Amino acid sequence: MHSATAAIAALGVSPLIRIRGTHSDLIKRALDAGAYGIVVLQIHTAAEAGVVVSSSKFPSLGMRGQGLVFPAFIHGIDIPTYIRSANDTLITCVQIESVEGVRNVDAICAVPGVDMVFIGPNDLALSLLGYVPARGDEPEFQRAIENIVAAARRHGKWVGRLSNDGKASKIHLNVFDTVALSYDVRAMHN
């Protein structure tokens, strides 16, 4: 992970690491490896979002320990400077992709330290509709997306989503702050 984050950052791209669940040790490991942020999947409640923030931020915003010096080293700064700047510069993103997450999205977005909310449309469709992918025109799916975007905007959070193709991503960029296009596995397969 250390080599990958350094290589990605060297290209001028901000490496984010996806983490399944609110495991403090995995969040710390990703950030200690030099990730510029984390995306934590399957967040359903404000309490879970709070655990993510607490694990990813240094005191007084969280409980993250100093750990390795690698992030400071790759950023070319000393450790105290890295620690002072990390809470403001590293992205803490939670992914909403369930009916429960949509139901609690306003409370999730109200958690201080959550910087971005990302929509996982395929798992959201599976949870909401019982199938994937969503066609995109299902009223309940559209309402869920609109509710997530509205909550993020109300609380001053960035909001992003996955797009399954280039045409959709261009449309999504009119609404979302960031769009991930497809998956690396699909890109390699094609």
Q: Where are each of the predicted segments found?
A:
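Short, charged, surface-exposed secondary-structure boundary motifs
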Residues: 1, 48-51, 127-129, 188-190
